[in-house]
Amino acid sequence: PFAVFYPPIEHSMTTTLYRPVGPQELKLIKESGWTAFPPRLPDQPIFYPVTNEPYAIQIARDWNVPASGSGFVTRFEVETEYLKRFPVETVGAREHMELWVPAEELEEFNRHIVGKIEVTRSFPE
């Protein structure tokens, strides 16, 4: 369903990223005051925000809903300079681009989020 290439959207100081989440992760984000993602579980060594909303929608709708009954797309801004340390990985089709943040660096990553994490879509609709 994707026809165009979606690199991260860079603004002068921040880059827009997306993260598909299930209801439990969304609850923890809300408990943070919409400012941080929760620590990864022991079997989750990588935190992987994605670079475009269509890919986040696909994951939330096609993976999170079957796994947990609902899925949500979050959008947030991160300091562009900080993000340069993380490679953008293409997993599958060329629009399936993710940043791979080691779980042990997530707390630091959260400190570089600018503003609030917001929900842009929810599934089922």
Regions found by a protein language model. Give the residues of each.
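Short, Lys/Arg-enriched N-terminal segments with co-localized hydrophobic residues
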Residues: 1-12
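Conserved NAD+-utilizing ADP-ribose enzyme module
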Residues: 10-47, 53-125
